[in-house]
Amino acid sequence: MQPRVLLVAALLSLLASARASEAEDTSLLGFMQGYMQHATKTAKDALTSVQESQVAQQARGWVTDGFSSLKDYWSTVKDKLSGFWDLNPEAKPTLAEAA
């Protein structure tokens, strides 16, 4: 065989193998995209079912009630402690009075 024929045959085989590899990469990419779409849908469905479940609604109610109680407690403490300091700036001694 002539060297040109061998060179052309080698180039054609390299080109064919590159095309086959490219096709495999494309199919792998498509498979991964499909898998990720399916995983995303599954995760969204699971999150929706958890959010809609009765236990989640009850837990949200407990958290809301807890924050309300905390606000009420803080308001009570603040009211009780406000008697310990005078908010009137005129009642504070000045430096001239202290000396």
From Swiss-Prot:
Glycosylated residues in this chain: 94
Cellular component GO terms, alphabetical: chylomicron; intermediate-density lipoprotein particle; spherical high-density lipoprotein particle; very-low-density lipoprotein particle
InterPro entries: Apo-CIII (IPR008403), Apo_CIII_sf (IPR038195)
Site (May interact with the LDL receptor): 41
Cellular compartment(s): Secreted
Pfam families to which the protein is assigned, alphabetical: Apo-CIII
Keyword Manganese set for record: no
Post-translational modification: The most abundant glycoforms are characterized by an O-linked disaccharide galactose linked to N-acetylgalactosamine (Gal-GalNAc), further modified with up to 3 sialic acid residues. Less abundant glycoforms are characterized by more complex and fucosylated glycan moieties. O-glycosylated on Thr-94 with a core 1 or possibly core 8 glycan.
GO MF terms, alphabetically ordered: high-density lipoprotein particle receptor binding; lipase inhibitor activity; phospholipid binding
Entry's family note: Belongs to the apolipoprotein C3 family.
Entry-linked PANTHER family: APOLIPOPROTEIN C-III (PTHR14225:SF0)
Function of the protein: Component of triglyceride-rich very low density lipoproteins (VLDL) and high density lipoproteins (HDL) in plasma. Plays a multifaceted role in triglyceride homeostasis. Intracellularly, promotes hepatic very low density lipoprotein 1 (VLDL1) assembly and secretion; extracellularly, attenuates hydrolysis and clearance of triglyceride-rich lipoproteins (TRLs). Impairs the lipolysis of TRLs by inhibiting lipoprotein lipase and the hepatic uptake of TRLs by remnant receptors.
Record-given protein name: Apolipoprotein C-III
